[in-house]
Structure formats: C-alpha cells, structure tokens
Amino acid sequence: VKAIIPAAGLGTRFLPATKAQPKEMLPVVNKPIIQYVVEEAAAAGVTDVLIVTGRGKRAIEDHFDRSVELEQLLERSRATEQLHEVCAISDLADVFYVRQKRPRGLGHAVLCGASHVANEPFFVLLGDVIVPRNDCLPRLKDVHERYGGSVVAVSPVEPAMVSRYGVIAGEEVEPGVWRVTDLVEKPAVNEAPSTLAIFGRY
C-alpha cells in the first residue's frame, strides 16, 4: 500500500517559526508533526511513502534517514530507550522523496507523485495535519473498496468555522458516508453547503 504526503508548502502561516525549518518538522510534544503522519500511514498498512518536498525541506529527509553517529552515541551512553525510538523512525516505511520545483498547490504536489503510484489506489495525507484517531485511513479504504472512486475524509465543524476549510456538498448514502456533489473552498458562512470540512486525508 502506498501513500503520498505533500510537504512542499512554505509554511507562511507559522512564521517566524518556519523561516528556517519546515512546518512539518515543528514539534508536537517530542516528535515532529510529519512523524505522526507517517506513523498513522504505517499503522494503516502503508509500506511505501512518497513525501513531496520543496526547497528548504532537507530536514524531513534527514529525519527519516538513519543517523549512525547518533545511534552509536546513544549506544555508548546506554540510552536504550532513546536508541530504540531513533532507530524506529527509519523503519516505519520505505520513504521516498520527490521535489515540487515550484509552489503550484496541493493538486500539483500530488501529481508530482503520479509515476510513483502508477495506477494503484493510494492514500494522500497532508504533512502538517495530525489525525487523533487511527481508524481514518482504514475507513477511507473500506469506502473506496465498496463504492469505488476517490474518497475524501470530512469532519463536522462549527458553522462559524466553515470559512477556514474546504467544505463538501452531497447526499448521505449511508450513515457517515456522503456522495460528494461539490467542493467549496473556504466559503462565506452564509454560502456554505454544509458544515462537513475536508481535513487532509484522501
């Protein structure tokens, strides 16, 4: 099973914290955001991850690579728990990279991975969004297998918040599953077709 993780954005909403480091590498507790995303993919059976990066994102590649010097230092220091944690990062999945040479948006970032996934179904996980539950990707896969086509994860938001998200219009075909008829990006509160917001899992 394959996944594409777009991580090429400039992170301007998080300035100045992202001036010199990728937003995907901002820490949440003791791990960078993107590690949670790759862990979520791996927990859903993904073994092949393509991360779409851009200029200034080398830290992402270094994070998922082995660090022999660090591992040796931890081993000499008998920091067994930290050694295990550091080694586990590079064993989460086979991680590949492709660079989006110019910022052309999310759709283009996913398209950069087209030759990698070929004609197989694949997941897309935004590299700066943490999903608190691990059942999202299995549910997306289940809906895809039963209905075919592309599947997007949505979550209800407060009506006053719809202008911050892409929102779907559609008909509910079974509890929790909608056939999407339209996507509206950041609608005005009074023009939103629903309160079901897209949150970065496809």
How would you describe each model-predicted region?
Residues G45-V46, A118, R146, R179:
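Short loop/turn motifs at secondary-structure junctions
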Residues D62, E69-E75, T80-E172:
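Conserved beta-loop-beta/alpha segment of the NTase-like Rossmann-fold superfamily
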Residues E24, D94-F96, R179:
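Conserved beta-strand segments of alpha/beta enzyme cores
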Residues I33-Y36, H108-C112, D182:
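Well-ordered alpha-helical segments embedded in enzymatic catalytic cores
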Residues P27, Y97-R99, V152, D182-E185:
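Structural signal for conserved beta-strand scaffold positions within catalytic alpha/beta enzyme cores
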